[in-house]
Amino acid sequence: MSSSEEVSWISWFCGLRGNEFFCEVDEDYIQDKFNLTGLNEQVPHYRQALDMILDLEPDEELEDNPNQSDLIEQAAEMLYGLIHARYILTNRGIAQMLEKYQQGDFGYCPRVYCENQPMLPIGLSDIPGEAMVKLYCPKCMDVYTPKSSRHHHTDGAYFGTGFPHMLFMVHPEYRPKRPANQFVPRLYGFKIHPMAYQLQLQAASNFKSPVKTIR
């Protein structure tokens, strides 16, 4: 990103293809060192990465070293993601994500009986690099892989394991009711008993077993 561009680094990052799930973290939140406690131990090139996020002038050595600049860019993306995971647990962050949720920016539940229920991003781990972002349906309370492949490489730690639950704790009025309908397997119009498959499996197993001769 060139220095002649007026758009901030945060707006640029959130506008990238594949980063649609992110909201723009307020710079005031990032500038409060208390909110960044411990992140310097998780992110390499922490100081330079933070300066990049806040659009501060980079060191001259960094401008003259393209390889180092790429490393700082990667570190800035990681740092922003970890800050983002904390920010969306605050009232301001929840408000921004709630707006995206209401607009369906995160997609809709593929389950038929959830009737196009909007979903929320969630991480299966709070540790970076362990799992990619998933989508949580508050109606069936299950998680799904994002439909678009461009979201398959977004780290789940940048949203955290508790975000959807925090949102509904703060705004319980947006929590949907559980699905009224449940799919019922049928064969020739009759409901299939839960034990039917097990009994059929046992019967097939007995049929395949060799008959023992009694002497």
Curated annotation (Swiss-Prot):
<dbReference type="GO" id="GO:0008285">
    <property type="term" value="P:negative regulation of cell population proliferation"/>
</dbReference>
<dbReference type="GO" id="GO:0033211">
    <property type="term" value="P:adiponectin-activated signaling pathway"/>
</dbReference>
<dbReference type="GO" id="GO:0005576">
    <property type="term" value="C:extracellular region"/>
</dbReference>
<dbReference type="GO" id="GO:0060391">
    <property type="term" value="P:positive regulation of SMAD protein signal transduction"/>
</dbReference>
<dbReference type="GO" id="GO:0016055">
    <property type="term" value="P:Wnt signaling pathway"/>
</dbReference>
<comment type="function">
    <text>(Microbial infection) Upon infection with Epstein-Barr virus (EBV), the interaction with viral EBNA1 increases the association of CK2 with PML proteins, which increases PML phosphorylation by CK2, triggering the polyubiquitylation and degradation of PML. Seems to also suppress EBV reactivation by mediating ARK2N and JUN at the Z promoter which inhibits BZLF1 transcrition.</text>
</comment>
<feature type="short sequence motif" description="KSSR motif">
    <location>
        <begin position="147"/>
        <end position="150"/>
    </location>
</feature>
<dbReference type="GO" id="GO:0032927">
    <property type="term" value="P:positive regulation of activin receptor signaling pathway"/>
</dbReference>
<dbReference type="GO" id="GO:0018107">
    <property type="term" value="P:peptidyl-threonine phosphorylation"/>
</dbReference>
<protein>
    <recommendedName>
        <fullName>Casein kinase II subunit beta</fullName>
    </recommendedName>
</protein>
<dbReference type="GO" id="GO:0065003">
    <property type="term" value="P:protein-containing complex assembly"/>
</dbReference>
<dbReference type="GO" id="GO:0000785">
    <property type="term" value="C:chromatin"/>
</dbReference>
<dbReference type="GO" id="GO:0005654">
    <property type="term" value="C:nucleoplasm"/>
</dbReference>
<dbReference type="InterPro" id="IPR016149">
    <property type="entry name" value="Casein_kin_II_reg-sub_N"/>
</dbReference>
<keyword id="KW-0832">Ubl conjugation</keyword>
<keyword id="KW-0539">Nucleus</keyword>
<feature type="binding site">
    <location>
        <position position="137"/>
    </location>
    <ligand>
        <name>Zn(2+)</name>
    </ligand>
</feature>
<dbReference type="InterPro" id="IPR000704">
    <property type="entry name" value="Casein_kinase_II_reg-sub"/>
</dbReference>
<dbReference type="GO" id="GO:0005956">
    <property type="term" value="C:protein kinase CK2 complex"/>
</dbReference>
<dbReference type="GO" id="GO:0003682">
    <property type="term" value="F:chromatin binding"/>
</dbReference>
<dbReference type="GO" id="GO:0019904">
    <property type="term" value="F:protein domain specific binding"/>
</dbReference>
<comment type="subunit">
    <text>(Microbial infection) Interacts (via KSSR motif) with Epstein-Barr virus EBNA1; the interaction requires phosphorylation of EBNA1, is independent and simultaneous to EBNA1 interaction with USP7 as well as necessary for PML nuclear bodies disruption by EBNA1. EBNA1, USP7 and CSNK2B form a ternary complex.</text>
</comment>
<dbReference type="GO" id="GO:0001650">
    <property type="term" value="C:fibrillar center"/>
</dbReference>
<dbReference type="GO" id="GO:0030674">
    <property type="term" value="F:protein-macromolecule adaptor activity"/>
</dbReference>
<keyword id="KW-0479">Metal-binding</keyword>
<dbReference type="GO" id="GO:0070062">
    <property type="term" value="C:extracellular exosome"/>
</dbReference>
<feature type="region of interest" description="Interaction with alpha subunit">
    <location>
        <begin position="188"/>
        <end position="193"/>
    </location>
</feature>
<dbReference type="GO" id="GO:0004674">
    <property type="term" value="F:protein serine/threonine kinase activity"/>
</dbReference>
<dbReference type="GO" id="GO:0042802">
    <property type="term" value="F:identical protein binding"/>
</dbReference>
<dbReference type="GO" id="GO:0005634">
    <property type="term" value="C:nucleus"/>
</dbReference>
<feature type="binding site">
    <location>
        <position position="140"/>
    </location>
    <ligand>
        <name>Zn(2+)</name>
    </ligand>
</feature>
<dbReference type="GO" id="GO:0075342">
    <property type="term" value="P:symbiont-mediated disruption of host cell PML body"/>
</dbReference>
<feature type="modified residue" description="N-acetylserine">
    <location>
        <position position="2"/>
    </location>
</feature>
<feature type="cross-link" description="Glycyl lysine isopeptide (Lys-Gly) (interchain with G-Cter in SUMO2); alternate">
    <location>
        <position position="212"/>
    </location>
</feature>
<feature type="modified residue" description="Phosphothreonine">
    <location>
        <position position="37"/>
    </location>
</feature>
<dbReference type="GO" id="GO:0051101">
    <property type="term" value="P:regulation of DNA binding"/>
</dbReference>
<dbReference type="GO" id="GO:0046872">
    <property type="term" value="F:metal ion binding"/>
</dbReference>
<keyword id="KW-1017">Isopeptide bond</keyword>
<dbReference type="InterPro" id="IPR035991">
    <property type="entry name" value="Casein_kinase_II_beta-like"/>
</dbReference>
<dbReference type="GO" id="GO:1904813">
    <property type="term" value="C:ficolin-1-rich granule lumen"/>
</dbReference>
<feature type="modified residue" description="Phosphoserine">
    <location>
        <position position="69"/>
    </location>
</feature>
<keyword id="KW-0879">Wnt signaling pathway</keyword>
